[in-house]
Amino acid sequence: MMRFVPLFLACISLPAFQATEFTKCEVSHAIEDMDGYQGISLLEWTCVLFHTSGYDSQAIVKNNGSTEYGLFQISNRNWCKSSEFPESENICDISCDKFLDDELADDIVCAKKIVAIKGIDYWKAHKPMCSEKLEQWRCEKPGAPALVVPALNSETPVP
């Protein structure tokens, strides 16, 4: 019995699970500093992320020979590095696996690069689903719990 005590203590000290699917309000709060970046509203971003990943930070989608990762569905063809697509341009200079956690700061930095280079229509859901009638994407819960995002704002330079 005594040899199981350390294992038991280790298990209860770890979180039971890591959340990967978030609510509209959690995502909206976590990315609120993106509001207005390159003229894109928070409501547009909230809508795009719903239609892109379903607010799932661990979403992985195979698409035309490449793979898209995380909440923003960032492609390994151009933006991040993965072993399955070694010829990637890796414009964001990051491993694609970094987009599969709940730490969104690196996802946001890369998303800002994508928007600066390609525009919001890089995310195919934007034009048909997120360019008008956006009130449904408003979050009415003040103080919704934030995902792990260090202080960023729309003025944060994109490296």
Curated annotation (Swiss-Prot):
Glycosylation sites: 64
MF terms (GO), sorted A to Z: calcium ion binding; lactose synthase activity; lysozyme activity
Disulfide bond in keyword set: yes
Keywords: Calcium, Disulfide bond, Glycoprotein, Lactose biosynthesis, Metal-binding, Milk protein, Secreted, Signal
C-type lysozyme domain location: 20-142
Protein name: Alpha-lactalbumin
Source organism: Rattus norvegicus (Rat)
Signal peptide from the UniProt entry: 1-19
Oligomeric form and interacting partners: Lactose synthase (LS) is a heterodimer of a catalytic component, beta1,4-galactosyltransferase (beta4Gal-T1) and a regulatory component, alpha-lactalbumin (LA).
Tissue: Mammary gland specific. Secreted in milk.
Intrachain disulfide bonds: 25-139, 47-130, 80-96, 92-110
Annotated gene: Lalba
Pfam family, one: Lys
